[in-house]
A protein has these predicted regions:
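N-terminal export and membrane-targeting signals
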Residues: 1-13
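Low-complexity, intrinsically disordered/propeptide-like segments
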Residues: 11, 25-30, 137-140
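Core hydrophobic alpha-helical transmembrane segments of single-pass membrane proteins
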Residues: 11-21
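Generic hydrophobic/packing signal
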Residues: 16, 25, 107-109
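C-terminal region of N-terminal signal peptides and the immediate post-cleavage residues
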Residues: 20-38
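Solvent-exposed hydroxyl-ligand-binding patches built from regularly spaced Ser/Thr
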Residues: 32-172
Length: 172
């Protein structure tokens, strides 16, 4: 009887050690997929300034709400822009709650698209440009001829405090 208890104890010990080794290998395994920082949060608004700094660019940005559907219709009616139960034109309504400028860093290699007559017609004239060219546009220069001015608004994609992509919004 005693030898049976010893055998069971040894088997239990081996099972526990095997489970611990398996768990250590499984949960600490490196997938080998090192990915870049995500470029996620999308924010709509207007660029107030875009200045070059030592490591890239600094942007002062005025966020706004770009709403559509029921959200846009109700907000516009509450603001007296449309009659209650009437739809907003083009199914969107921009809400400017204030003009608090937020500061974002802009990666000098960020993807930027603006709207031009030479751009991709399937994407409303979307044309890639550099951050440097965007800074020139914000300063009133014309490195490219825009289809409509930047005050139509832009969408920025942000990772924490850094803009990694920026796209001009089309306004019909």
């Amino acid at each position: 009887m005693r030898s049976r208890s010893v055998v069971l104890a040894v088997i239990a010990f081996i099972a526990i050690v095997a489970a611990a080794v398996f768990a250590t290998l499984y949960f600490t395994k490196d997938s080998g997929n090192e990915s870049a920082a995500p470029c996620g949060d999308r924010i709509f608004g207007h660029i107030s300034s875009l200045k070059q700094t030592d490591g890239g660019y600094e942007m002062r940005f005025d966020p706004a709400w770009f709403t559509s559907g029921v959200t846009a219709n109700v907000a516009a009616a509450e603001d007296g822009v449309v009659e209650p139960c009437e739809p907003v034109p083009n199914d969107n309504y921009r809400i400017e709650e204030g003009h608090r400028l937020l500061t974002y860093l802009v990666d000098p290699d960020a993807q930027v698209t603006v709207l031009t007559r030479q751009g991709d017609p399937a994407n409303f004239g979307s044309t890639p440009i550099t951050v440097s060219e965007l800074a020139q546009l914000v300063d009133g220069e014309k490195p490219v001829e825009l289809f409509e001015p930047l005050d139509t608004g832009v969408w920025i994609r942000v990772n924490v405090d850094t803009v990694c992509a920026l796209d001009q919004q089309y306004q019909p």
